[in-house]
Amino acid sequence: MHPLEKFEYCPLCGSHHFETNGATSKKCENCGFEYFMNPSASNVAIIKNVKGEILVERRKQEPAKGMLDLPGGFAQIGETSEEGVCREVMEETGLKVVSAQYLFSLPNVYRYSGIDIHTLDMFYLCEVEDDSALAAGDDAAECMWIKPEDIHTEQFGLRSVRWGLIKFLVRQDRFKSAEEAQK
């Protein structure tokens, strides 16, 4: 189901004449208000320690509860993507990001409360001040360091994180191809 199908009433005037107007919008026949469904901004941190291991988390909540993940989450209103990734890393791991370098973005669909939330996940290579303060918090049940060669992407619950890890590891020459990364 497309997320726009859940919106039956105009959020401006309350009219029931809120009709689909193309693939990404609905328009009110009563007041003329047009609502565009755009992806939500989300941030993902790839953090390596001095041994070259990558920081991963075990998800505490749905979706994909109990599966592996990378630190990250939704951007908040008024913050930059860089501020968002720093905030999420602090909330979920207790670590302070001192550098966040943008890598790439991937689209994703995040099922939450029965609705498919379309996201644009922005991946950052982050450097932290001191990784000895590592402690799981917020959405993370636990945090751990994993050697790149020990990463099995099928253990990660979110599609964009799986593909983001593959893309990152292929770039780092940890895998020769995306197919090898999925083995």
Which functions belong to the PLM regions below?
Residues 1-6, 133-183:
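Nudix hydrolase/Nudix homology domain
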Residues 30-54, 74:
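Conserved N-terminal beta-strand and adjoining loop/helix that marks the start
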Residues 18-19, 36:
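Short functional micro-motifs and their immediate structural scaffolds
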Residues 19-25:
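Short linker/helix segments within small regulatory modules
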Residues 10-13, 28-31:
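Short cysteine-rich clusters marking metal-coordination/redox-active sites
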Residues 3-7, 24, 41:
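Short metal-coordination and nucleic-acid-contact micro-motifs, chiefly zinc-binding Cys/His arrays
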Residues 49-91:
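Conserved Nudix-box catalytic region and its N-terminal flanking loop in Nudix hydrolases
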Residues 104-132:
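Active-site-adjacent beta-strand/loop module that shapes the phosphate/pyrophosphate-binding cleft
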